[in-house]
């Protein structure tokens, strides 16, 4: 089991933590990461885009003029795709973009993402966040003590009110619970900050 330093919210070293190597120190599986991130990004799409074909555009039931004798081109509807205000040909329609991924692959991708941060020394273990105030300015000073000045993802098990309010006004900080943290979120940050409870959660779920 690899050992990792644990600090408090003041940036002081308080202990070391034995991390399970089968969760935090595996060789990242690139295909699993690709499949899961592709599925998670697809799930972000609403899929509500829609256009109207000639069948759904209002009007156009009557033939605009007789077939022969006018000298004009023949038409059967003013809602033909050839006309201004007519229907759209092969336009987008509502659809579900979700992609199924097996749980085994999802867990492998999550372990790969955690291990990637561990191996690149971009993982920060904090015992807990107990903030006295909900001010973002004060929380920013706390992050500076942890040497966090760029894009960061903070994963906790249960978020308290002060932590939620203090972090949401910082554009480079994302707060997420361990149960809802995604592989895409983890790989899309420079600094991964985990509380000890979050570490215990991942080691239990991904064992």
UniProtKB/Swiss-Prot annotation:
Listed Pfam families: Ribosomal_L4
For this entry, list what GO says about its biological process.
translation
Q: Where is this region: Disordered?
A: 56-77
The record's GO molecular-function terms, alphabetically, read: rRNA binding; structural constituent of ribosome
Compositional bias (Basic residues): 63-77
Q: Which UniProt keywords apply?
A: Ribonucleoprotein, Ribosomal protein, RNA-binding, rRNA-binding
How is this protein annotated for GO cellular component? Answer: ribonucleoprotein complex; ribosome
Q: What does this protein do?
A: One of the primary rRNA binding proteins, this protein initially binds near the 5'-end of the 23S rRNA. It is important during the early stages of 50S assembly. It makes multiple contacts with different domains of the 23S rRNA in the assembled 50S subunit and ribosome. Forms part of the polypeptide exit tunnel.
Give the protein family.
Belongs to the universal ribosomal protein uL4 family.
| Subunit composition and interactions | Part of the 50S ribosomal subunit.
Q: What's the protein name?
A: Large ribosomal subunit protein uL4
What is the protein's species of origin?
Phytoplasma australiense
Q: Which gene encodes it?
A: rplD
């Amino acid at each position: 089991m690899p050992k990792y330093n644990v600090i408090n919210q003041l940036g002081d070293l308080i202990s070391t933590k034995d991390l399970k190597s089968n969760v935090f120190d595996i060789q990242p599986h690139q295909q699993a990461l690709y499949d899961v991130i592709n599925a998670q990004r697809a799930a972000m799409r609403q899929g509500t885009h829609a256009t109207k074909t000639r069948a759904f555009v209002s009007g156009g039931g009557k033939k605009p003029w007789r077939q022969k004798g006018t000298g004009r081109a023949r038409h059967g509807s003013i809602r033909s795709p050839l006309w201004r205000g007519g229907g759209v040909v092969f336009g987008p329609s509502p659809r579900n973009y979700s992609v199924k991924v097996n749980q085994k692959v999802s867990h492998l991708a999550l372990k790969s993402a955690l291990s990637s941060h561990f191996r690149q020394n971009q993982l920060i273990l904090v015992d807990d966040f107990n903030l006295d105030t909900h001010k973002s300015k004060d929380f920013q000073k706390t992050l500076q003590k942890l040497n966090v000045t760029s894009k960061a993802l903070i994963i906790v098990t249960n978020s308290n009110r002060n932590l939620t309010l203090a972090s949401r006004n910082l554009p480079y900080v994302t707060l997420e619970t361990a149960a809802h943290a995604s592989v895409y979120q983890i790989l899309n940050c420079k600094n991964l900050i985990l509380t000890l409870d979050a570490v215990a959660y991942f080691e239990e779920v991904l064992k």
